[in-house]
Amino acid sequence: MTQEDIKDMMLYGERINLEYKEAFNELPKSFWETYSSFANTIGGQIVLGIKEHRTKMTMQERFEIQGVNNAAKILKTLWDTVNSDKVSRNILLDENVETIDYDGKQLIVVTIPMANYTERPIY
């Protein structure tokens, strides 16, 4: 994924299979709810490092690229947690998680696959 891909995605905002999350200093707790939701349906992407201003009307104003302060720390938390008993099953592979440079700010893109029906429910 490239910076241009992120720009294109942001033109249309969040969707049923795409969520943006603010994650400047840590992995947000809401990440796991979205992980479960995407895994149990059609899959999707979570982009960490984008803040939503809910009162803004246009997509250009509504979503702000903040980046993540310490990508390595957030990635460690993600992998440690997904491989612990906090999550019923890890369905992520290394290639499902990437760090993107966006105008000097780091974003983390997590592509969550749809869980096989024998693996569900993911919680």
Where are these regions (language model features)?
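Conserved N-terminal catalytic/coupling substructures associated with nucleotide/phosphate chemistry
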Residues: 1-123
